[in-house]
């Protein structure tokens, strides 16, 4: 079931309700900032605190307009270019476009990705349940 974000504007009369439905599909690019023990990468030595500081620094740099692809190349603990096409819950993935179902992604990654507008940047913070691989700095590109 797709989620909708609704805002009620209360005036004298009538009451207006504006709903923004999540898109059926998105394409995002992301930077994964992991720490030792979250992914099988032997040369990863940073601890959780170091990863959090680095992720927040990169997030701010991206929000301030640094080239996102350059940041991905320099910092991601995932593969470059780190681009994922996703279909929302209830929408069949288009296999011909290498699209993933949102349900296959970690929850925080999917939640942030589908809330962003095109060219917006968001941060999915590490959580052992919803973002178990580390911090994801996400830019929606389509």
PLM ranges: what are they?
Residues 45-142:
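Peptidyl-prolyl cis-trans isomerase
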Residues 1-4:
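Positively charged n-region of N-terminal signal peptides that target proteins for export
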Residues 15-18:
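C-terminal motif of bacterial Sec signal peptides marking the signal peptidase cleavage site
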Residues 20-30:
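Bacterial Sec signal peptide processing site at the extreme N-terminus
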Residues 11-12:
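Repetitive helical segments and hydrophobic/amphipathic motifs
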């Amino acid at each position: 079931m797709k989620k909708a974000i609704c805002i009620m504007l209360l005036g004298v009369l009538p009451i207006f309700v504006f709903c923004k439905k999540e898109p059926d599909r998105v394409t995002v690019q992301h930077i994964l900032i992991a720490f030792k023990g979250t992914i099988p990468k032997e040369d990863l030595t940073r601890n959780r605190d170091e990863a959090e500081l680095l992720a927040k620094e990169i997030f701010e740099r991206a929000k301030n307009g640094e080239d996102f692809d350059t940041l991905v190349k320099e910092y991601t603990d995932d593969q470059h270019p780190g681009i994922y096409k996703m279909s929302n819950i209830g929408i069949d993935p288009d296999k011909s476009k290498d699209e993933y179902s949102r349900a296959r992604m970690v929850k925080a990654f999917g939640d942030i990705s589908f809330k962003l507008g095109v060219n917006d940047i968001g941060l999915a913070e590490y959580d052992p349940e919803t973002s178990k691989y580390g911090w994801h700095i996400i830019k929606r590109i389509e």
